[in-house]
Amino acid sequence: MNIKEEAIETEGIVKESLPNTMFRVELKNKHIVLAHLSGKMRKHFIKIVPGDKVKVELSPYDLTKGRIVYREK
């Protein structure tokens, strides 16, 4: 099985911007996770600011960390 297939994808709202493209994201179920920006978003200079609605991929092994893969318009 591919790691990408195992990832849990959910939506959330960015609450805080941290150094090194890290963000605190509040998920729909009110959990707070620490998320970093995906490589493609860094490459294309997609900016994320607090208040943005984003899609986050979580690993089933550590549900406190994730990767931001999409920013809603």
Curated annotation (Swiss-Prot):
Start and end residues of each S1-like domain: 1-73
Keyword Kinase: no
UniProt-listed PROSITE patterns: S1_IF1_TYPE
A Pfam family recorded for this sequence: eIF-1a
NCBIfam families attached to this UniProt entry: infA (TIGR00008)
Protein family per UniProt: Belongs to the IF-1 family.
UniProt entry keywords in alphabetical sequence: Cytoplasm, Initiation factor, Protein biosynthesis, RNA-binding, rRNA-binding
Matches recorded under SMART domains: S1
Origin organism lineage: Bacteria, Pseudomonadati, Spirochaetota, Spirochaetia, Spirochaetales
Biological function: One of the essential components for the initiation of protein synthesis. Stabilizes the binding of IF-2 and IF-3 on the 30S subunit to which N-formylmethionyl-tRNA(fMet) subsequently binds. Helps modulate mRNA selection, yielding the 30S pre-initiation complex (PIC). Upon addition of the 50S ribosomal subunit IF-1, IF-2 and IF-3 are released leaving the mature 70S translation initiation complex.
InterPro entries, A to Z: NA-bd_OB-fold, RNA-binding_domain_S1_IF1, S1_domain, TIF_IF1
One cellular-component annotation, GO: cytosol
HAMAP family: IF_1
Location(s), subcellular: Cytoplasm
GO molecular function: ribosome binding; rRNA binding; translation initiation factor activity
Quaternary data: Component of the 30S ribosomal translation pre-initiation complex which assembles on the 30S ribosome in the order IF-2 and IF-3, IF-1 and N-formylmethionyl-tRNA(fMet); mRNA recruitment can occur at any time during PIC assembly.
Main localization, broad class: cytoplasm
Organism the protein comes from: Borreliella burgdorferi (strain ATCC 35210 / DSM 4680 / CIP 102532 / B31) (Borrelia burgdorferi)
Record's protein name: Translation initiation factor IF-1
